[in-house]
Swiss-Prot record:
This is Phytanoyl-CoA dioxygenase domain-containing protein 1. Belongs to the PhyH family. PHYHD1 subfamily. GO terms for molecular function: dioxygenase activity; metal ion binding. It comes from Bos taurus. Keywords: Dioxygenase, Iron, Metal-binding, Oxidoreductase, Phosphoprotein. Its EC number is 1.14.11.-. 2-oxoglutarate(2OG)-dependent dioxygenase that catalyzes the conversion of 2-oxoglutarate to succinate and CO(2) in an iron-dependent manner. However, does not couple 2OG turnover to the hydroxylation of acyl-coenzyme A derivatives, implying that it is not directly involved in phytanoyl coenzyme-A metabolism. Does not show detectable activity towards fatty acid CoA thioesters. The gene is PHYHD1. It holds the Pfam family PhyH.
Length: 291
């Protein structure tokens, strides 16, 4: 079981994040990595959908490329790519398996290996110890952080993209499938930054618009001295409050930094914003965590 102790719960409430080392075994990590290798080996992405992923605001809006490919990925398993991996015709400049930034956004629902991890007894026990009554899974991602050029993730709050009313209802679970160290792009947090609300939001634009999203508000300039690095070993789980500010640096090392991450929402008494880029569909309503 993975229940939090009172001291762990207090630390999460104070800092907005919490590291749980050894949450998954090496065998559990290897099973997900083997499965993702199989998924990548069968990758078939049309030229017009080869969408580079970025969290820099202007680049992000440009990089969506195929608006529908991104906006309709919530109930599918789709591929998003690093910058600079395609030529002007959309052909790969690097081996395809080294080109991927992430795979999202419904591994938790559509793949049995990832569904099993997401709904495991350990995850359910963790959610219960956090007091979640009706948690649902809203999205999932497999993040590669490729060696030598795995892109940085700029400072952000997850609730900017997954907005709810009231706030404080979104929780990220980030699982290291490889050691995540300073050299290969571990997570960095500003402890206690989850108490000041959300500075900006990414919202859908009217149907047919290109790009399909825009930003309301702006990300303030953050004091870099406030960020604390959070290196973790393979198998660790990092709990991430939806409003805590976090980032990761570019991976310039020769080691990847693979991770599986998914987001929960407390559905009881919560409104999922209809302006969010991600929306439940008739084919895939947000599945309850508790089974």
């Amino acid at each position: 079981m993975a229940c939090l102790s009172p001291s762990q719960l207090q630390k999460f409430q104070e800092d907005g994040f919490l590291v749980l080392e050894g949450f998954l075994s090496a065998d559990e990590c290897e099973a997900m990595q083997r499965r993702i290798d199989e998924i990548v080996a069968k990758m078939d992405v049309p030229l017009h959908c080869r969408t580079e992923f970025s969290t820099q605001e202007e680049e992000q809006l440009r990089a969506q490329g195929s608006t529908d490919y991104f906006l309709s990925s919530g109930d599918k398993i789709r591929f998003f790519f690093e910058k600079g991996v395609f030529d002007k015709q959309g052909n790969f400049l690097v081996p395809p398996e080294k080109s991927i930034n992430k795979i999202g956004h419904a591994l938790h629902a559509l793949d049995p290996i990832f569904r099993c991890v997401t709904h495991s007894h350990k995850v359910q026990a963790l959610a219960r110890s956090l007091g979640l009554q009706m948690p649902v899974v809203v999205q999932s991602m497999y993040i590669f952080k490729q060696p030598h050029f795995g892109g940085e993730v700029a400072p952000h709050q997850d609730a900017s993209f997954l907005y709810t009313e009231p706030l404080g209802r979104v929780l990220g679970l980030w699982i290291a499938l490889e050691d995540a160290m300073l050299e290969n792009g571990c997570l960095w947090f500003i402890p206690g930054s989850h108490t000041g609300g959300v500075s900006r939001r990414m919202v859908r634009t009217p149907a047919g618009s290109v790009p399909g999203t825009s930003f309301l508000g702006s990300e303030p300039i953050r004091d870099n001295s406030l960020f604390v690095p959070t290196p973790v070993l393979r198998g660790a789980l990092v709990l991430i409050h939806g409003e805590v500010v976090h980032k990761s640096e570019q991976n310039l090392s020769d080691r990847s930094r693979q991770a599986y991450t998914f987001h929960l929402m407390e559905a009881a008494g919560t409104i999922w914003s209809p302006d969010n880029w991600l929306q439940p569909t008739p084919e895939l309503p947000f599945p309850p965590l508790y089974t």
